[in-house]
Amino acid sequence: MTTTLFTNVHIATGMPGSTAAETTPLQDILVEDGRFKKIGQRLVAKLATQGMDISSIETIDLEGKLACPPFCDTHLHLDYVFTARKPGAVNESGTLFEGIQRWSETKSDLTVDEVKERAKIGIAKEMRHGVQFIRSHADVTDPNLTSLKALLELKEELKDTVTLQIVSFPQEGMYSYEGPHGESGADLVEEGLKMGADCVGGIPHFEQCREFGERSMHTVVELASKYNKLIDVHCDETDDPNSRYLELLSALAYRAGIGSKTTASHTCSLGSADNAYFFHLSKLLKAAHINFACAPTENLYLQGRQDTFPKRRGITRVKELTEAGVNVSLGQDSMQDPWYPVGNGNMMLILDYVLHLAQMMSFEEIDDALKFLTVNGATTLGMRDSYGLEAGKPANFIVLDASSVFDAVYERCDVLRSVREGRTLFTRNTSITTDLDLLTL
């Protein structure tokens, strides 16, 4: 039996068993065989009185820092990472649609090994920022299914250090794409599910006509029901307020009884829709338990390109959805690809952006903000039952360089330690050396 005792740590707010940031007492965490055994105050003394030989246990002092569950990135494209400077891939207009065009024109030379090598670098960057759970889309509008094969291999190879969910995603459309042998995007999505993808993807706003987009939403729900898969659709990623595939997706998922297994990603058009429409739609979204994945940095960059001024922010209604009781999580989306020239997997930066863009900056909202990266993400991924700092669950957690959630958020603090099933994946030292008293404050 492997036992580790982590001492002197604050537990982040918004997590099971936690209280307000300012009053959370220091606690200790006992891990046995990769699972949380006990979490509580003055645990060292209690265990000693129960006859446990503390001196024989590996003990790690967390020095009053903040612990929370590992971060979740619920929207990423690992097969695209670090292709932004590839010949022919440069996106001159900075629009979503040119990004799709550039990718489609330059992806024919992909190999499984090359995709895996790039994706591993992207995963490593995310993990160094405290991410242990990633949902990545894999483009299947490729008769060779190269991206999907690569990411499925990585999912298995890295399962002990990071959890990957893979979306069978038709980047060029379910019914607008036709392969060299007459196969449709829908055919390839289904083939991806048979190969082991976790989620059904879609992109209705990119289809050639409204009818194709609507048909694709029916297909998504039918495939998810047929193969017992999750759903994650790139939905209404446009400034057009009349793009309303979210409404159809939500209604179909609700009627099929799989709303809680469904994620609508981006939904930028919801930020352009009027309040009367949102008021009507929010009732359906809440009843269906639809999840949302927002990629604030990328949507800010790609959207509003046809606007002069006023210029739209491009993101979905994060604040209003949250206030309506709808689950919203966050994603990096891209790392240096034809859609977005930067991105380094730092989810604290993604959180910072969404709080600013959604104007969620009250003290109460900031104190509650880590939920977007943690429990909300786990809800989107369908992993709540095995996620969180609770006895009996896998001992997965990170330690932040702060003592409260507020400090962590406003400092965009570093991750000092990442623990996976009781095993420390990495530690980081953020101390500085100085002779100036001022710089020690």
Where are these regions (language model features)?
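His/Asp/Glu-enriched, well-ordered alpha-helical/loop segment
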Residues: 230, 251-262, 298-302, 312-400
